Amino acid sequence: MKFSMLSLLLAMLIYFCVGHSLAQTGLTDDVDSQSESMADVMNYFPMTNGVGTAGQPTPAQFALIKAAKYSAVINLAVAQSVNALPNEAKIVTDLDMSYQHIPVPWDAPTASHVKEFFETMDMLRHQASPVLVHCAANYRASVFTYKYLTLRQGLSKEEATTPLLKEWLPQMDDNWKAIMALSLNDIE
């Protein structure tokens, strides 16, 4: 688990350092002019019922998210995440999408965080808003979305499990196992 998380954090750091270096030199113009798709958004996975999950999108990828018909974004990452965008709320709302930030500490997720997420999802789903849920790498987003889709929407475990969550389950630490074990009564 530690090796996997360290590898993931190192990969994200390299990705964003290289991207920042390219932006400084102006070499991203050629990259940005190439056609990107939702598949280019880190760990993107479209779920059922107008819900998708992802890792941290780049500023330019939020336009792709809008073009993919998502009208709301929920960010579960903390502001101190290595790849966080300090102006993400403005980027998203400037594209006429709604933005909700529910910072969930990686090492201390709680039932209260899940409850706030459920309430936000209920509000957005009541408005028939397709929602993209993201965090730094799609781990938090996958767990919270899984809980919502199984407990609130009645989807099967198979339908609600992202490929990333399936891979992570055997390595998950006790904090996240506790979140996975929550019942609806524990959350409400």
Residue ranges and their predicted role:
Residues M1-S7:
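Positively charged n-region of N-terminal signal peptides that target proteins for export
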Residues S21-V131, Y146-E188:
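Cys-dependent protein tyrosine phosphatase-like superfamily
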